[in-house]
Amino acid sequence: AKIKIIVLDRPNPIKGNLIEGPLLNMDYQSFVGNYPIPIRYGLSIGELAKMMVGEKWIKGAPKLSVIKMKNWNRNQWYDETGLAWIKPSPNIPDLNTALIYPGMCLLEATNINEGRGTDKPFKRFGAPWIDNARLSNRLNKIKMPGVEFKPVTYIPTDIDGMAINPTFKNKICKGIEIKIIDRDIYQSVQIGLNIISILRDEYPNKFVINDKRMISLLGVDELNIFNEMPIDLKTIFSNINFIETSKKYI
């Protein structure tokens, strides 16, 4: 018998009107990407649940009931809702981290420390062999929208409940801290991809991408995009079909 599933809907913390990143190719379905949606999909959890059932992505789909929200505007950031922030993950302590995460989580498929083991996970990244002054200058010259990059030095350590054996544990890392200047134009996935592209260009003998892991995180086998600088997602990936289909569930 089908089990009834009740979803108490809640706001998408990084707005419900922005979509970013490639559409998952189901050939690369995995624990971190299970359905054909972009990295940043622009739906509430209830809307996504309705789409999963409506598009028959689940075999033996449950009887779904979504308890709708009241007074949510898709253009709202979470801190504009009046609701208290509750960490969705130990390493996403605040809203800015949630916004940065869709792009910077891609560093988890590399040999760079992604800020785990610090009080600013995903807001900073580094390695012992990075020239942080040179790298910050190069990143800032691209003039990516809504962001500035500043050089930092830090030491990743174990943090109870947050990080165990972070990359470059107890080693001095020279790196970059991400400062969001305008969150409304900040393009998380595009910024993450450009950072990886530049690291690959700057440190071809030291920076390493785990191809299999990166394909899982991206959801597509398009690693040649890291040959481009700067990367413009709009010219590479199209989410038109997803956008049109998702409208049925909004």
PLM-predicted stretches and their roles:
Residues 126-240:
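Conserved functional hotspot residues or short segments at active or partner-binding sites
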Residues 29-102:
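Conserved anion/nucleotide-ligand pocket segment
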Residues 6-28:
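Glycine-rich, charge-decorated loop segments at or immediately adjacent to ligand/cofactor-binding or catalytic sites
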Residues 8-11, 69-70, 127, 181:
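Active-site-proximal beta-strand/loop segments in catalytic clefts of secreted hydrolases
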Residues 2-4:
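A short helix->loop->beta-strand "cap" motif at the edges of active sites that frequently abuts
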